[in-house]
């Protein structure tokens, strides 16, 4: 049986850290930035961790489980 392929969309959007947590980027940072404050844009620049409730489905998409 061939190897299972990971979902390419998930592969491009998520990164697994050394401790096994999954990093993601924030949305709302691509266009229409003039009405957003500098503080908000700076906060959206930093990466965040995936919430525990979404962890199982993302790990399945990345074929970690």
From Swiss-Prot:
GO molecular function: structural constituent of ribosome
GO cellular component entries: cytosolic large ribosomal subunit
Pfam families in the cross-refs: Ribosomal_L35p
GO biological processes: translation
TM stretches of this protein: none
PROSITE patterns membership: RIBOSOMAL_L35
Keywords: Ribonucleoprotein, Ribosomal protein
Segments of this protein annotated with the region Disordered: 1-22
Keyword Transmembrane listed: no
Superkingdom as given in the UniProt entry: Bacteria
Keyword flag Ribonucleoprotein: yes
SUPFAM superfamilies for the chain: L35p-like
Family designation: Belongs to the bacterial ribosomal protein bL35 family.
Protein name per UniProt: Large ribosomal subunit protein bL35
Source organism (scientific name): Flavobacterium psychrophilum (strain ATCC 49511 / DSM 21280 / CIP 103535 / JIP02/86)
Biological classification of the source: Bacteria, Pseudomonadati, Bacteroidota, Flavobacteriia, Flavobacteriales
């Amino acid at each position: 049986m061939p190897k299972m392929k990971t979902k390419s969309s998930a592969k491009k959007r998520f990164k697994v850290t050394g401790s096994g947590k999954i990093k993601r980027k924030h949305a709302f940072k691509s266009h229409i930035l003039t009405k957003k404050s500098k503080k908000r844009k700076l906060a959206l620049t930093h990466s965040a961790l995936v919430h525990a409730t979404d962890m199982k489905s993302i790990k399945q998409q990345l074929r970690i489980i």
